Regions:
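N-terminal secretory targeting modules
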Residues: 1-21
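Short alpha-helical segments and helix-capping/turn motifs at coil-helix boundaries
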Residues: 7-13, 63-71, 223-225
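Membrane-embedded segments
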Residues: 21, 26-122
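Short loop/turn segments at strand-loop or loop-helix junctions that form parts
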Residues: 28, 83-88, 241-246, 282-285
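Well-ordered, non-membrane alpha-helical segments in soluble/globular domains
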Residues: 64-67, 218-226, 257-268
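Secreted/periplasmic serine-hydrolase-like ester/acetyl group-modifying domain
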Residues: 85, 101-235
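Active-site segments of SGNH/GDSL-like serine hydrolases
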Residues: 229-256
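C-terminal regions of proteins
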Residues: 251-316
Length: 316
């Protein structure tokens, strides 16, 4: 699958629209892209026979709302909806990319809430949405990416992948039938070369991780999240999922990222207990049983690490 010609949110929204034979559907960000029932190292095998991975880069609560509405309308065979909790999940507007399908979001939100409730929520967050739109328009990375696409003579397209070794990758990243991703051979090699002692890195890019120091969660976002879970529970069994960060990220517990993970994991378990939802995994790699060599970078675990997630299972 070559880059740029398709917006991945369109791809995964369409995957959600077509009924599959999967008994589990997983919602999350790039941290879950390696979760798979199609590989040798299967993930969530005790909970799922076959899963559909709807992991999207930079996925936020707004993405979950859009995809969940499509799931409710189209997925009849699934039994479990597994929602990945990130350090930024219980906030609104932590990434601008969901605005790609803002119209779908507005429709989904109206279906979730009564008219009076929806008017209140819409008024509360409209201003920040407009700010995000403006920021996205002037974002230098977005601008450069768009410019390169316009000037490129390459034939960016989606094509069927030939047989290849999943461990080594192939010329481009590959979307597997279950929605999980195999990185390109070039990316896999780069990751092997770039592995470093992350404990030496004292300052982390909080913006890239969707974390705002001190703002671990928002009341309004949590209310929307709870409403979403209750809506899904009418048709499915809902499970929360937490994936670990690299052990070296945890070496300095005064980092805002560590404080965020501790507070959010605590809040996620608190919400899960109230809603009678089970929780799989943890931000802490020691609890899951993951080692440094089982990570691709600071926040993305390999399929080997992710195959251990059910080592931490909290029933509610």
């Amino acid at each position: 699958m070559k880059n740029y010609v398709w917006n991945e949110r369109d791809i995964y929204l369409n995957l959600a629209k077509y009924e599959s034979d999967s008994d589990c559907i997983v919602l999350g960000s790039s941290q879950i892209k390696q979760i798979s029932s199609y590989r040798k190292k299967r993930s969530l095998s005790s909970s799922c026979n076959q899963l559909l991975n709807l992991g999207i880069n930079g996925a936020v609560l707004e993405d979950y709302i859009v995809l969940s509405q499509s799931i409710l309308e189209n997925q009849k065979k699934a039994k479990n909806i597994i929602i990945a909790i990130n350090a930024w999940t219980f906030n609104l507007n932590r990434d601008a990319r969901w605005l790609h399908y803002k119209d779908d979001y507005d429709i989904a939100l109206k279906k979730m809430f009564s008219e009076n409730d929806n008017n209140y929520i819409t008024n509360e967050i409209t201003a920040s949405y407009q700010t995000l739109l403006i920021k996205n328009l002037i974002n230098i990375k977005y601008f450069i990416s768009s410019l390169n696409l316009i000037n490129s003579k390459k034939n960016y397209s989606i094509e069927m992948a030939k047989d290849f070794n999943f461990e080594l990758g192939t010329t481009h990243k590959v979307l597997l039938p279950d929605g999980s991703i195999i990185s390109s051979a070039e990316t896999i090699e780069e990751r092997k070369k770039n592995k470093k002692d992350l404990s030496k890195k004292r300052e982390w890019n909080m913006q890239n991780w969707g974390i705002v120091p001190g703002v671990w969660y928002e009341k309004n976002a949590i209310n929307i999240f709870i409403k979403l879970v209750n809506q899904l529970k009418k048709n499915f069994n809902v499970i929360f999922l937490i994936t670990p960060y690299h052990p070296d990220v945890w070496s300095n517990e005064e980092q805002p990222s560590i404080k965020a993970m501790k507070n959010v994991e605590l809040k996620a378990n608190e919400i899960a207990k109230i809603l009678n939802v089970d929780v799989i995994g943890s931000f802490n790699p020691e609890k899951v049983g993951c080692y440094s060599n089982e990570f691709m970078d600071e926040i993305h675990a390999t399929d080997l690490c992710l195959s251990k997630l059910e080592n931490v299972y909290v029933s509610n």
